[in-house]
Amino acid sequence: MGEKLICNNKKAFHDYFIEERFEAGMVLKGTEVKSLRMGKANLNDSFALVRDGEIFLHNLHINPYDFGNRQNHDPDRLRKLLMHKSEIEKLFGKIREKGYSVVPLRLYFKNGLAKVELGLAKGKKLYDKREDMKKKDQSREMAQALRERSKSH
């Protein structure tokens, strides 16, 4: 069946260095799955925390299902993630180190199951962000110059 992307967290790549990636399943309610299939989710400002050997996703906003009734889900509820115990322990060890956090990078369906890609992230300093922006600008200008040059010939 493959993968169907629901949403990306572009802000995470701007604010953090992503050192390692993990895939996790999510415990969801029926109306949340239907809302995700419609592509109504927001990963901005969300993060994952390990508590009592389990990992939870905070601030993931899934819009209420449009055709749901009064038993619709809470859009900002805490969602449990499903990972192997060894992966959770590895993440927990890294989170305890200063400067590391776990952020969701993208939300997608894989073979009909909702998955979230987590990134082990270290925060960028302001000068790192400026360097990244400079590199992007330079590559954009170079590509533009090449396009203009190829048009003139």
Curated annotation (Swiss-Prot):
Belongs to the SmpB family. Residues 129-153 are annotated as: Disordered. SUPFAM superfamilies: Small protein B (SmpB). It comes from Geobacter metallireducens (strain ATCC 53774 / DSM 7210 / GS-15). Its main location: cytoplasm. It is found in: Cytoplasm. Required for rescue of stalled ribosomes mediated by trans-translation. Binds to transfer-messenger RNA (tmRNA), required for stable association of tmRNA with ribosomes. tmRNA and SmpB together mimic tRNA shape, replacing the anticodon stem-loop with SmpB. tmRNA is encoded by the ssrA gene; the 2 termini fold to resemble tRNA(Ala) and it encodes a 'tag peptide', a short internal open reading frame. During trans-translation Ala-aminoacylated tmRNA acts like a tRNA, entering the A-site of stalled ribosomes, displacing the stalled mRNA. GO terms for molecular function: RNA binding. The keyword Mitochondrion does not apply. This is SsrA-binding protein. GO terms for biological process: trans-translation. Keywords: Cytoplasm, RNA-binding.
